[in-house]
Every structure is written in C-alpha cells, then in structure tokens.
C-alpha cells in the first residue's frame, strides 16, 4: 500500500544519504524512482541530490509553483514509477504537500520526503508543517550535538562564526552557516539561558 513518508531531522543527520540509499535500493531491483530537490538549494550544484559523504544523483528541480501530480502523471505516460523521493522537503508549499497526498492516494505511488523540521528560530517550515500533519508515516533521523546529546535544533552562524538570532527564514548554507544542537546548547548559544546564582 502506498504511503506518504516524512523523514525529518536537524542538519547533518544523513537525510540526503538515506534518500540516495533508498533510491539505489529501488533501482537495484529494476524499479524506477523519480527524485526531486528544491531549486532554491544550490549548495552542491543545480539538479543534484548530494550527500556529505560524497555520493550524488541527478534530480528534477521543484519550484514553489511545481505541480507534482501533473508532473508525475506526465512521467507515467513514458514509464512506470515505483517511488517518488523529495529532498529538501521543508521547502514544499502546503499545496504541494496536498499534491503529494494525491500522488499516493490516486496514483498509488509511495512518496518519501526528507527535510528539516524547524528553522534556526525553532519555527516549522511550511512544507514540514503539513508533512508532519498529513504524512502517513513519520520518522526522525538523529544527529548529535557537540555535547553528545541528540540534536533537535539548528543554529545559524554569521561569517565570523557567531550565532545569528534574527533574519529571513530561508538562507541557503551548509556547515559554514549552520550547526545542529540540543535544546540546552540552542538556548546557551542564543543567550536565552537565565543566569542562576546559588
């Protein structure tokens, strides 16, 4: 039975690596996958899903006006599809997440989405919000903070490596601009912990 899956985490948890491994597993069995990545994310080149461990795969770009249901139906005219995979799914719109539920429910094709849960302000991205609400299956991919605890949050850094607390929700960057941290270190690095004297 086809389902909509959302694999979410902070940065550097291996979301793209997991997507690429899943795509490889399908292809190894002679099955066709259709892989998308956000057009806005050009860190590793245009039209590629790239992992920090050095593997990559060509991908179709999605924009805020991409209609996934229409595009998948077009591809189905030429070949059978066994799975749709979306990297950087936090950049999806509410409408696009709904279209992906239609791909699952009407076309009976599983859709695997991989993305961040929250931004550097601990706020949900639009795509993540609706994937968390509408996905059939949710799975957190784990990464660790500098202290060894599970990292849930992302800190944005400026060019001097200092914590940034304001700004636009979306600013594309990698390890030079973002680090994943636990809640305690999120608060500490943002100066949000109270000074308690004993």
UniProtKB/Swiss-Prot annotation:
Q: Where does the chain bind Zn(2+)?
A: 145, 147, 182, 185
Q: Name one GO cellular component term.
A: cytosol
Which ranges of the sequence are coiled-coil? none
> What is this protein's record name?
Thymidine kinase
Q: Which enzyme type, at the first EC level?
A: transferase
Tell me what organism the protein belongs to: Haemophilus ducreyi (strain 35000HP / ATCC 700724)
What keyword terms does UniProt attach to this protein?
A: ATP-binding, Cytoplasm, DNA synthesis, Kinase, Metal-binding, Nucleotide-binding, Transferase, Zinc
Q: What is its main location?
A: cytoplasm
Q: Whom does it interact with, and what assembly results?
A: Homotetramer.
List locations, semicolon-separated.
Answer: Cytoplasm
GO function terms (MF aspect): ATP binding; thymidine kinase activity; zinc ion binding
Please write the reaction equations for the catalytic activity of this protein: thymidine + ATP = dTMP + ADP + H(+)
HAMAP family in the cross-refs: Thymidine_kinase (MF_00124)
Give the matching PROSITE patterns: TK_CELLULAR_TYPE
Q: Which cysteines are joined by disulfide bonds?
A: none
């Amino acid at each position: 039975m086809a389902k909509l899956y959302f694999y979410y985490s902070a940065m550097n948890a291996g979301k793209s690596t997991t997507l690429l491994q899943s795509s490889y597993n399908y292809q190894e069995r002679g099955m066709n996958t259709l892989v998308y990545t956000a057009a806005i994310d050009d860190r590793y080149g245009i039209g590629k899903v790239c992992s920090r461990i050095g593997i990559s795969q060509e991908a179709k770009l999605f924009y805020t006006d991409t209609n996934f249901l229409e595009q998948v139906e077009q591809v189905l005219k030429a070949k059978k599809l066994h799975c749709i995979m979306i990297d950087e799914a936090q950049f999806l719109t509410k409408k696009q997440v709904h279209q992906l539920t239609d791909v699952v429910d009407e076309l009976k094709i599983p859709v695997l989405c991989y993305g961040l849960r929250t931004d550097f302000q601990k706020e949900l991205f639009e795509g993540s919000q609706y994937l968390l609400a509408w996905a059939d299956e949710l799975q957190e991919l784990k990464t660790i903070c500098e202290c060894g605890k599970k990292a849930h949050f992302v800190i944005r850094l400026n060019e001097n490596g200092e914590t940034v607390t304001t700004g636009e929700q979306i600013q594309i960057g990698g390890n030079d601009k973002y680090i994943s941290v636990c809640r305690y270190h999120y608060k500490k690095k943002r100066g949000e912990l109270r000074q308690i004297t004993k």
